[in-house]
Amino acid sequence: PQPEIIELIQDKRKQKQFYTSNNIPTAKYILTNSKQEVVDNKHFLPAVNKLGTEGYDGRGVQILRTVDDLDKAFDKQGLLEKLIDFDTEIAVIVARTVTGEIVTYPAVELVFHPEHNLVEYLFSPANVSAEVAKKAEKIAIEVIEKLGMIGILAVEMFVDKKGDVLVNEVAPRPHNSGHQTIEGNITSQYEQHLRAVLGWPLGKTQQILPAAMVNILGHEGYTGIARYEGMDEILREEGVHVHLYGKKITKPYRKMGHVTLVAQEPEILKNKVNFVKKTLKVKA
């Protein structure tokens, strides 16, 4: 993406201000500069304390539900974001060319690790109503247009209990929430990104089959040279595709790769996802 867009997006404070200044729906928030300022705003709890910069893969995020959690607050520039009572988390991948052509991919449903704030697995398409899917698509298009961005943009969103869709954050690149497009959609997010930045016509985004993605994470309690258990077993499964990142050293919850899966039926797909999660382990 363009340098000015990287500058905006790499700071979550600037991101949130961009959303509010452009009337893009997002959770209420307060900018903070220190741990004391977080404590001073305890009336805003329950909330999520996010670092302005340096956060990635779940790092730089603390959930503060009550005053007893305030010790976990960051003593750096960041923000307090109102904790959303959401039904599900979704993402829409959107692409835009220099000529303004835009396409979106079907919304995907994200399932996060309960403790480490990073995506554990996802399903595509998301199990949401047509109305919610349409809202999410419209918001993703609005975000990439307002940014004036060229390339692929992943827009992560909450769907609350009322069916409202709120932007959480965005990533200006091929993203974890689009890996399944390699096997699951007519055009992968990687090919689409190249088409967008080269000014070529954008590819079709329709879903070929129900698809899923499971992140391969370092197993808890193991640090050292990575050793994969269960690889042979999962590779025998039809529709299972392993993508490793070539990282030699594993650490607890480090992203070591991902598995993309396709199946004819959503129920079969869920069973395959559970099998991969249970079988494939990264130890040392």
PLM segments and residue spans:
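Short acidic-glycine loop/turn motifs at beta-strand connectors
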Residues: 96-101, 160-163, 263-265
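A short linear hydrophobic-aromatic micro-motif
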Residues: 28, 46-49, 78-81, 153-154, ...
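Active-site "cap" helix and flanking loop/linker of ATP-utilizing ligase/carboxylase catalytic domains
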Residues: 135-155, 161, 171-223
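Short, flexible active-site loops
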Residues: 116-126, 169-182
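Active-site nucleotide/adenylate-binding loops and adjacent lid/helix of ATP-dependent enzymes
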Residues: 6-91, 95-143, 277
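A short, glycine/Asx- and small/polar-enriched loop/turn
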Residues: 43-44, 160-166, 253-255
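Protein kinase-like catalytic core scaffold
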Residues: 103-106, 153, 165-169
